[in-house]
Curated annotation (Swiss-Prot):
Organism classification: Archaea, Thermoproteota, Thermoprotei, Sulfolobales, Sulfolobaceae
Pfam families, per database record: YbjQ_1
Family: Belongs to the UPF0145 family.
Descriptive protein name: UPF0145 protein YG5714_0873
Organism annotation: Saccharolobus islandicus (strain Y.G.57.14 / Yellowstone #1) (Sulfolobus islandicus)
InterPro entries: UPF0145_dom_sf, UPF0145_YbjQ-like
Length: 114
């Protein structure tokens, strides 16, 4: 995957086809903490009674992952990277209404194979 506006390649793989890693710059992390809020918790409780997807939480989770990913890419750019490999996501419940979402990977400089 590429983020043209960021000019950074990102992948969950260890390598990027067609590119060679020329320098490893280190681990980069992007974190966001989101609050579900009282309304969201109430809606989730009501939906859990009948079952099914809780769309408000899905949307919040997607936005949080994207924010964490963007922050991780920003850290990589600060190091001079043009790619991030081995990207992973993690999440933790900080308390009953707050979740921490983390994106992390290895910032690298890559060169296109000739």
């Amino acid at each position: 995957m590429s983020y043209p506006e960021a000019n950074v390649l990102v992948t969950t793989a260890e390598t990027i086809p067609g590119y060679t890693i020329v320098e490893v710059l280190g681990i980069v992390v992007g974190i966001t903490v989101r609050s579900r809020g009282l309304g969201g918790n109430l809606m989730a409780a009501l939906r859990s009674l009948v079952g099914g997807e809780i769309k408000e939480f899905v949307e919040m989770a997607e936005q949080a992952r994207m924010q964490a990913l963007i922050r991780m890419i920003d850290r990589a750019k600060e190091l001079g990277a043009n790619a991030v490999v081995n990207i992973r996501f993690d999440s933790n419940e900080l308390n009953q209404s707050m979740d921490e979402i983390i994106a992390y990977g290895t910032a690298v400089k890559v060169a296109k194979n000739s």
